[in-house]
Every structure is written in C-alpha cells, then in structure tokens.
Amino acid sequence: MKKHGILNSDLAKIVDDLGHTDRVCIGDLGLPIPSGVRKIDLSLKAGFPSFQDLLDVYLEHVLVEKIILAEEIKEQNPEQLSQILRKLDDGVTVEYVSHEQLKALNQDVKAVIRTGENTPYSNIILQSGVTI
C-alpha cells in the first residue's frame, strides 16, 4: 500500500502523466464537465473536500506556471481568490477570463477534479510548468 503522496489512484495517475503546459481543472460542485473530458469526482458532501484542500495537495505535487480563473471570482468570492493567490509561487502567471470562457477551456484539460466546494466561482485551471 502506498504510504506517501497522492493516495487517490485516478488523481495520482493524472499528476504522474502531466507534461509541460498540460492543464487540469479543480472545480466546485456546480461546474459542468464537458463530455469526453476525464472526471475525477472527489466530492463526498457539500463542502467536503474543499477546493482549498485539493489545491493544497495539487500544488504540493505539481509545478504550476500559470493559472486561469473566472473574472467573476474577484467580486463574488474574494476570500477564495485571496487564498489562491497567497499559495502561488513567485512567477506564476494569473489569467482571468469569463466564467463561460473558463468552462469552454475545460474542453482541453487532461481532467476536471470535482470537489465538494459549494462557494461561487471556486474553479481553477492549472497549467503545468517544467522543472528543467
């Protein structure tokens, strides 16, 4: 049995297979997932696991060069935005698009990880960096 790292086998496989510029989305309960895109549904109940719980684990294991957020998070969920920005390494590019554009961008992600988060616009696309 695995002792360390990401224990969820589906999530671990996605993380292990990431290459430079590959994208993964961490989403809230309400984020629609496009047909044909891999869904890793970790939601157990409203609020659990939280968006921040998943973001912490993801950032511990993946070098991120860019994130994409919905513009609406600035006004509709500023506390969530503040927590996200505090966790980013220096040099990570932050891009804001409309919520509709973010949903459209999910057509090309490697996976959408659904959390139990039940606060508005708690969705992020994370683009992998390169360690060399």
From Swiss-Prot:
Top enzyme class of this protein? isomerase
Q: Which residues form the active site?
A: 20
Report the EC number(s), separated by commas if there are several. Answer: 5.4.99.62
Residues bound to substrate are 28, 99, 121-123
Family matches, as Gene3D superfamilies: RbsD-like domain
Q: Gene Ontology cellular component?
A: cytosol
In which compartments does the protein localize?
A: Cytoplasm
Catalytic activity, reaction form = beta-D-ribopyranose = beta-D-ribofuranose
Pathway listed: Carbohydrate metabolism; D-ribose degradation; D-ribose 5-phosphate from beta-D-ribopyranose: step 1/2
The GO annotation for biological process reads: D-ribose catabolic process
- Isomerase is among the record's keywords: yes
Q: Which Pfam families match?
A: RbsD_FucU (PF05025)
UniProt keyword annotations, A-Z: Carbohydrate metabolism, Cytoplasm, Isomerase
Matching entries from HAMAP family are given as: D_rib_pyranase (MF_01661)
The record's comment on protein family reads: Belongs to the RbsD / FucU family. RbsD subfamily.
Assembly and binders = Homodecamer.
Question: Per its UniProt record, what NCBIfam families does this chain match?
Answer: PRK11797.1
Function, as annotated: Catalyzes the interconversion of beta-pyran and beta-furan forms of D-ribose.
What is this protein called in UniProt? D-ribose pyranase
> Which organism does this record belong to?
Streptococcus uberis (strain ATCC BAA-854 / 0140J)
